[in-house]
UniProtKB/Swiss-Prot annotation:
Protein name, entry field: Ras-like GTP-binding protein Rho1
Traits of the deletion mutant: Embryonic lethal. Embryos exhibit severe defects in head involution and imperfect dorsal closure. During head involution, the head structures fail to internalize resulting in holes in the dorsal anterior region of the cuticle. The disruption in the dorsal surface stretches the ventral surface, causing the cuticle to bow.
Recorded superkingdom: Eukaryota
Tissue/organ expression: Expressed in hemocytes (at protein level).
Residues excised as propeptide: 190-192
Species per Swiss-Prot/TrEMBL record: Drosophila melanogaster
Quaternary structure annotation from Swiss-Prot or TrEMBL: Interacts with capu. Interacts (via REM repeats) with Pkn (via N-terminus). Interacts (via N-terminus) with wash (via N-terminus). May interact with dia/diaphanous (via CBD/FH3 domain).
Gene: Rho1
Sequence motif Effector region, residues: 34-42
Chain positions recorded as GTP binding sites: 12-19, 59-63, 117-120
Any one GO biological process: apical constriction
C-alpha cells in the first residue's frame, strides 16, 4: 500500500498554541515551556478512512517579525490549520484581519480548518478574571463557528493540547480535507 503524503501548515497569532498542538499530536507530550517558533517541521503518520497518510506538519511563527519569512512555508500546502486561542479574543479578531487574507493570497483554494486552541481555559477562573479586567471574556464556541462560516472554513474544531481533548479530531479532519482536494497541475513559471 503506497503512503499518501500531504502537507499541513499551521498559522495563527504568536502564543496561541500552535506548536503545542503539533507536538502533542506528533509526539504525544505537552511542552511545559513556551519557546517562540521560527520554523519547525514534524512528520506524523495518521490513518483516516482506511488510508495511510504521512502528514508533514509545518509550524510557523505568528509574530509580526516573521511576516516576510512565513510565506516560504506555503508552497504545495494541502491543508491549513488556522488557529486562535479561546483565552484570547484578540487572536480570534486577527483571523479575518490578518490570517485569512494572508492564507487566501498564498494558498488559494486550500481548505482551512479553523481551530480554537486552549479550550480548557474557557472555564478557568484565572483566565476569566484576567480577561474581565480588560472587559473581555473567553471566546464562545458559537463565536468560533460564526468565524468559520465568515471565512468559509472547511470545518471549525476546538481542542486542548494540555488535556489532549479534541487533538486527534483536528488532524483527522485536516487529513480528510487534504484528501478531498484534487491537486491542480503544477504550473511552471516561464521567464521569457
Amino acid at each position: 500500500m503506497t503512503t499518501i503524503r500531504k502537507k499541513l501548515v499551521i498559522v495563527g497569532d504568536g502564543a496561541c498554541g500552535k506548536t503545542c498542538l503539533l507536538i502533542v499530536f506528533s509526539k504525544d507530550q505537552f511542552p511545559e515551556v513556551y519557546v517562540p517558533t521560527v520554523f519547525e517541521n514534524y512528520v506524523a503518520d495518521i490513518e483516516v478512512d482506511g488510508k495511510q497518510v504521512e502528514l508533514a506538519l509545518w509550524d510557523t511563527a505568528g509574530q509580526e517579525d516573521y511576516d516576510r519569512l512565513r510565506p516560504l512555508s506555503y508552497p504545495d500546502t494541502d491543508v491549513i490549520l488556522m488557529c486562535f486561542s479561546v483565552d484570547s479574543p484578540d487572536s480570534l479578531e486577527n483571523i479575518p484581519e490578518k490570517w485569512t487574507p494572508e492564507v487566501k493570497h498564498f494558498c488559494p483554494n486550500v481548505p482551512i480548518i479553523l481551530v480554537g486552541n486552549k479550550k480548557d481555559l474557557r472555564n478557568d477562573p484565572n483566565t476569566i478574571r484576567d480577561l474581565a479586567k480588560m472587559k473581555q471574556e473567553p471566546v464562545k464556541p458559537q463565536e468560533g463557528r460564526a468565524m468559520a462560516e465568515k471565512i468559509n472554513a472547511f470545518a471549525y474544531l476546538e481542542c486542548s493540547a494540555k488535556s489532549k481533548e479534541g487533538v486527534r479530531d483536528v488532524f483527522e479532519t485536516a487529513t480528510r480535507a487534504a484528501l478531498q482536494v484534487k491537486k491542480r497541475k503544477k504550473t511552471r513559471c516561464l521567464l521569457l
